[in-house]
Amino acid sequence: MGYYNNVFDECNDQTDIGRVIRDGREVILQAYNWESHKYDWWRNLDGKVPDIAKSGFTSAWLPPPSQSLAPEGYLPQDLYSLNSAYGSEHLLKSLLRKMKQYKVRAMADIVINHRVGTTRGHGGMYNRYDGISLPWDEHAVTSCTGGLGNRSTGDNFNGVPNVDHTQHFVRKDIIGWLRWLRNTVGFQDFRFDFARGYSANYVKEYIGAAKPLFSVGECWDSCNYNGHGLDYNQDSHRQRIISWIDATGQISAAFDFTTKGILQEAVKGQYWRLCDAQGKPPGVMGWWPSRAVTFLDNHDTGSTQAHWPFPSHHVMEGYAYILTHPGIPCVFYDHFYDWGSSIHDQIVKLIDIRRRQDIHSRSTVRVLKAESNLYAAIVGEKICMKLGDGSWCPSGRDWTLATSGHRYAVWHK
């Protein structure tokens, strides 16, 4: 089993950067997709804030706020310019004020692995940042991506200058920008994009300096496959994510790509995958649930990019799993707002059950059945749930059906 220590969880005298993780009652909405920049997005979300709050979401993950060479926001250039394809700085700040009014935290997508230059420098590459805020020169760019800085401390993001986080002046400027987002603009949470691209030690430094209430990193690499498909044992995959979390000083969560990879195969009649060799959930959720942000799809895996989509006919089975289980569930905008009122309302019902039964990120899981066409578990000793078309219901008169849908059912005591 993967190793971690839970000193951080047990400390009650941490600063507020630990409070949200210790509480463990988060439900996140990813509030955009890959096409959102084509619409008046900040204004669109402004109109949805009351529903987001009423539905039980504690935080909404917003797209990258800064000016970017690509409209989606993932090729940032002038970090301090908040006029983007999603809308103006004025509309963004208005949205953030409304979210605060409705007690929904705003999560900023922090894209600091790479930055597009404005002028040509060393080697004729666009690796200088003249004429904009944070006017770095080539020493801010890693040597492996055309700069005069040091080698990268992580994986390269090809095609654009990668930021050299070993440089003190770079880290100082990034911290200043993060503090500005946190204290002046109005974001409370951070999501670190392409977190494999630089050492988790720097994530630890940035969180410690800017003090977001909650942070999550994107550590996405391939699951373990063999000639016949997905391996049953994904321990090495989840251990890589666990190791990244540990290297942040345990103060950041991470997206549970292991659970996503397993769950989207399990719903195809392979529910035996949802129980590991120790009888626990097989993803990061099974080893370190308080740091595991579970999800079905995001703007990369789903939406119009569809790099690794969850099977569309099984989406509600997926949400019945992550919304009743430990970890920190994250719901995708498309599923919640674009796939019809039935799915929207079923998700809201599951969130409501989670709240009423006080299921949280550390709730216990007792797997009762994990067969080809049936998965059943008791979570927190408060709810019981099943997935699949196998016939099953909990024994005992204590259980009352709370909700059900296509290939899922949930009971409570």
UniProtKB/Swiss-Prot annotation:
Which residues are responsible for catalysis? D193 (nucleophile), E218 (proton donor)
Q: Is Metal-binding a UniProt keyword of this protein?
A: yes
Instruction: Give the E.C. number(s).
Output: 3.2.1.1
- Gene Ontology molecular function: alpha-amylase activity; calcium ion binding
Q: Which GO terms describe its cellular component?
A: cytosol; extracellular region
Q: Where in the cell is it found?
A: Cytoplasm, Cytosol
List the catalytic activities from the record. Answer: Endohydrolysis of (1->4)-alpha-D-glucosidic linkages in polysaccharides containing three or more (1->4)-alpha-linked D-glucose units
State whether keyword Metal-binding applies.
yes
The family note in this entry says: Belongs to the glycosyl hydrolase 13 family.
State what this protein does. Answer: Probable alpha-amylase that does not seem to be required for breakdown of transitory starch in leaves.
The identity of this protein, by name, is: Probable alpha-amylase 2
Organism of this sequence: Arabidopsis thaliana (Mouse-ear cress)
Query: What broad taxonomic lineage does this protein's source fall under?
Result: Eukaryota, Viridiplantae, Streptophyta, Embryophyta, Tracheophyta
